[in-house]
Amino acid sequence: MKEVPIARDGSITRVALVVNTRSRTGSRAYNRALELLRGFGLPITSAHPLQDPTRLPETVQEAVDEGNDLVVVGGGDGTISSIVDMLAHREVPLGLLPLGTANDFARTLHVPTDLEQACRTIAHGKIVDIDLGLSGNNYYANRASIGLGASVAKAMSPALKKRIGALAYPVATIRAWFDHKPFFARLTFPDGDHEPQEYPSLMQISVANGRYYGGGQIAAQDSGIDDSTLDISVIRHGGYRELVTVARGFRNGNLLNTDQADFFRTRRVRVETTPKMPVNIDGELVAHTPQDLSVARNALHVIVPRTWVDGR
């Protein structure tokens, strides 16, 4: 960890700013963010307002290749998930501007959603190492999910998120639930820390790296993003009443106290399903089952408030 404020750290001489202007508040935040970061003393050497989110990975990769000491990225959880592959296991830290709908990654790291305070955090915070999840060859920050969570990702249109913000998550969940069909799953644990598990009728499997995901849902009361483990919740299929019970459990972190769920903490898991199911990582459908998921320990350098202690 660095104990010198970032803006006065002599090792930070080149800073790139990359903003997804298609994120919920990205278009109106870009110019103000540039002004604030420079005002706080950060040496911004390149700035990229991107209207095409597909250009985010290549732009961040170029910023790293050009020798920047810090990459500041503005956007939501989908933006962060799309660029962590470029920064994983690299020496270049990430500065975060939460400009999305849910901003669960920022919530886990205690980064303020207020733009000025977020810029202040980048300038005066500290650099820490956190874990990433790994689904196949794809890194993710918050959660991978199979089942209802993947269906919610399909139902979460950019227009819906722009229009109603965080309310888009419960609306999309209800829409997805009506079309959801139960599925069979088998979970195996390569490290032998749990016995293989088979489930004939599931609603969802979640494999969480961060503490928060899905618009403020809590993986577990004691979960953290730097604990070198994944938190897995397996949700049995049920009716509307069971869905409400599960939603409440996720919201307050007490899902373990319901009969609808099983919980596992591990470093690696293999998930097989019938039928073959899409895998959603942080709102993007990137693969299908069978899928191997694991934790990438200390994979990302990121700036957090100086008061941040751990992932809780």
Task: Describe the role of every protein-language-model region.
Residues 73-77:
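N-terminal glycine-rich "phosphate-gripper" loop used for MgATP/nucleotide binding
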Residues 1-71, 81, 309-312:
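ATP/NTP phosphate-donor binding region
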